[in-house]
Regions:
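Feature for exported/extracytoplasmic and membrane-associated proteins, marking the mature portion
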Residues: 2-395, 399-403, 409, 446-536
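Glycine-rich, phosphate-binding/catalytic loops in enzymes
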Residues: 100-102, 430-433
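Metal-dependent active-site segment of extracytoplasmic phospho-/sulfohydrolases and closely related
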Residues: 404-431
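Membrane-proximal bilayer-interacting regions
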Residues: 421, 433-435, 476
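Extended amphipathic alpha-helical segments with heptad-repeat/coiled-coil character used for oligomerization
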Residues: 425-432, 438-444
Length: 536
């Protein structure tokens, strides 16, 4: 008789080794299996970066006049903040976390289908609402650990939240899935009169358009669609508070002038004036039009550097660990989103990464952000490992929603993963396993993505009758013909961008900006415009 050793669950940040996977070699392979957490340093935008601004510009008027097209800022948010979570490795989303059905979320699948999604017969959701949690609008399984994590971080005005789920197949364990939608979001946000022009971009955010926790063209683990990428908008890499602080580092200027912001700004303004005089006297390129564009970019770099120095008294303003709306205050007005145990435990790096990016995006310093969480290739032959990692992801997602609620601003959060997992029906009856099905292998046919939307004015209003885009078959596999997104990751991104635009009431611009890949777009829009007053 052959004896099989029962698999043990792994700590929340332990690396994953699978007999059916090659030893990880590349950085992306190491991230999805949890060997690397995606840590690193920030790349401060150079003067050639075309990041947009919205600071209350205090820079001298003659400096602004050097390049009128150089956007220095506005007095409020310009678009709804957008944060995406890239769960590297192929996480479970469908069934055990977000409910999916053969038409809508409560259109039940077969018993065998739910078993494949890790749910034994006594945990199957029903159309009557058994094992269903609908507090956030979008329906989750009542025992979802991702939902448990969201709720543990997010308590303020939960009823102002709703969302949608998209059954969509994607390849397992590969960063080559073009999942990341941030460039599409940026093209819409920076468009002028419904048209995007890299050389004539509008106003969006204060310091940079995009921010991500990885040093990649997408800012995350998964790629961005190649036809949407804009080299000048490559996400600035931030994954810790010191990176965020470094975004407004003026070098030794502040030290030289005893941290006097006004003097430092005047020095930078003087440099801008000298540079402008010099540029007017030389020819940099033989092509006159190209020469003019290059000089405008150089002038804009100096103008923006002056504006940043004039607008920020200290890098402390970007540090999430110094923000009592995140860390808590002595008066008890703000309970900590991440407490001392969170920030001294094994998930400290992921929580600080999330806090750094959410603060930049939700305060309007960046337009959109991507947080990569590694180690989601968790088909380890037991369930507890996946449950703990789903809970951690939920804590990070919930933190973003809570921070938006505390600042009274809207937020769209989007969660995706490269592929997914499936269960063979065996259960993990340990305390952490909860009697749910063990994850035994990759399975791209069970994959899906989802979004949660927070609206300070009340729960987002459905545009139709369902919260699901596309359908599942009763055996819990994606019906690949049910939506343009179901079997095409590029069109999955288009679908997400469409729904983001619709939250602003701008879906009519979609074809001009993104093409006609989705056909009749009305059927794929899940929510009406939030009607948020961006001038307030």
């Amino acid at each position: 008789m052959t004896l099989h050793k029962k698999p043990k669950h792994l700590p929340s940040n332990a690396p994953l080794l699978h007999a059916d996977h090659p030893r990880p070699v590349t950085r992306r392979e190491m991230i999805r299996q949890g060997f690397l957490g995606g840590v690193g340093t920030a790349f401060i935008p150079s003067m050639f970066s075309l990041f947009t601004g919205r600071a209350n510009a205090l820079v001298a008027s003659d400096i602004q006049d050097m390049n009128p097209a150089c956007t220095l800022g506005t007095e409020s948010l310009q678009k709804i903040p957008f944060i995406c979570f890239d769960l590297a490795g192929g996480a479970n989303i469908a069934g055990s976390n977000v409910l999916v059905g053969f038409n809508d979320q409560r259109d039940v699948l077969s018993t065998a289908g739910y078993s494949k999604l890790g749910l034994p017969p006594d945990m199957i959701p029903t159309s009557a609402g058994d094992n269903v949690d609908s507090e956030l609008g979008l329906e989750f399984h009542a025992t979802s650990q991702m939902l448990a994590g969201i709720k543990d971080s997010f308590s303020t005005n939960r009823g102002n939240t709703d969302g949608f789920v998209i059954p969509a197949r994607s390849e397992n364990d590969t960063a080559n899935n073009p999942h990341n939608p941030m460039y599409g979001i940026a093209r819409y946000a920076l468009a002028q009169n419904g048209s995007f022009d890299e050389n004539n971009m509008g106003s969006w955010a204060q310091l940079m358009a995009l921010v991500g926790s990885r040093s990649s063209m997408s800012g995350g683990n998964s790629m961005a669609p190649a036809d949407l990428m804009v080299s000048s908008l490559q996400p600035t890499k931030v994954d810790r508070p010191s990176d965020a602080r470094g975004l407004i580092n003026t070098g030794s200027l502040m030290t030289l002038f005893n941290n006097d912001t006004a003097v430092a700004a005047q020095v930078l303004e003087a440099m801008a004036r000298m540079s402008d005089d010099k540029l007017g006297a030389i020819q940099l390129l033989t092509d006159n039009a190209a020469d003019a564009r290059l000089k405008d970019m150089i002038r804009c770099g100096y103008v923006k550097a002056s504006d940043i120095a004039a607008s920020f008294s200290s890098p402390d303003i970007l540090d999430p660990t110094l923000d009592e709306r995140i860390m808590g205050d002595d008066q008890g007005n703000y309970p900590p989103i991440f407490n001392g145990d969170d920030l001294s435990g094994p998930n400290r790096g992921d929580y600080l990464k999330t806090a750094s990016i959410m603060k930049l995006v939700i305060e309007g310093r960046a337009g959109a952000g991507c947080v990569t969480l590694g180690g989601y290739d968790y088909h380890t032959g037991e369930r507890a490992t996946g449950e703990q990692r789903d809970y951690k992801a939920g804590r990070c997602i919930g933190a973003c929603l809570e921070y938006a609620a505390r600042l009274n601003v809207p937020l769209m959060v989007y969660i995706f993963s490269d592929g997914s997992v499936a269960s063979n029906g065996m259960t993990d009856d340990s305390m952490l396993g909860g009697g749910k099905g063990v994850w035994t292998g990759d399975n791209s046919s069970t994959a899906c993505s989802f979004s949660l939307i927070y609206n300070p004015g009340g729960r987002p209003q459905l545009a139709g009758t369902t919260r699901q885009i596309g359908t599942m078959r009763t055996d819990a596999s994606v019906n690949t013909g049910s939506s343009p997104a179901a079997n095409n990751v590029n069109q999955l991104v288009d679908t997400v961008v469409l729904n983001y635009m619709a939250l602003h009431g701008d879906q009519g611009q979609f074809a001009n900006l993104m093409g006609n890949s989705l056909g009749n777009i009305d059927q794929w829009i899940k929510f009406q415009s939030l009607g948020y007053n961006f001038a307030g």
